[in-house]
Amino acid sequence: MKVVEVKHPLIRHKVGLMREADISTKRFRELATEVGSLLTYEATSDFETEKVTIEGWNGPVEIDQIKGKKVTVVPILRAGLGMMDGVLEHIPSARISVVGIYRDEETLEPVPYFEKIVSNVEERIALVVDPMLATGGSMIATIDLLKSKGCTSIKALVLVAAPEGIAALEKAHPDIELYTASIDKCLNEQGYILPGLGDAGDKIFGTK
């Protein structure tokens, strides 16, 4: 599995700000969008382009345009919604697929409760977004679902990842790509990432 920890100074700075215990909902939400945008820039760097001639202000001009598969953004509810706008800044025409999964706080296992996947997902590149890759259960379950519907081009974008989650994801789906703003130290006994960001969903939605 291709794992990319994006170490750009802007990303490192912004993720650092997100770790503050008393960060406001507004600020956390803004930073999640900004880092999501920067991760999208990196994750799409291998998209193929083709030459197209258009009519410019002074006559015909040859330009580069993205070619190949179109994109579907797949936020994992609910926290993934906090990164979605950052992706759409760069790919505003992307279709949106939604997967609802929550983690059982006792077993740490993923529990699916909703899905709405675009009908032609097998023809698209799926960018799955979720702020935290902890145990990896929710991400694995989402990718299982996408593959069951024929999607073969999948990239996962997360703000913070634990080594345990990366290992689990690689074991389950070695053919996907993972882009993260930070690979953190470990999981604690409750399955939370250390040092992590806290509960990203609560911080994005103001329910902490």
UniProtKB/Swiss-Prot annotation:
Enzyme type, top EC level: transferase
CDD domains membership: PRTases_typeI (cd06223)
Binding site for 5-phospho-alpha-D-ribose 1-diphosphate: R78, R103, D130, P131, M132, L133, A134, T135, G136, G137, S138, D199
InterPro entries linked to this entry: PRibTrfase_dom, PRTase-like, Upp_B, UPRTase/APRTase, Ura_phspho_trans
Pathway: Pyrimidine metabolism; UMP biosynthesis via salvage pathway; UMP from uracil: step 1/1
Needed cofactors: Mg(2+)
Mechanisms controlling activity: Allosterically activated by GTP.
Record-linked Pfam families: UPRTase
Presence of the UniProt keyword Glycosyltransferase in the record: yes
Listed name of the protein: Uracil phosphoribosyltransferase
Gene expressing this chain: upp
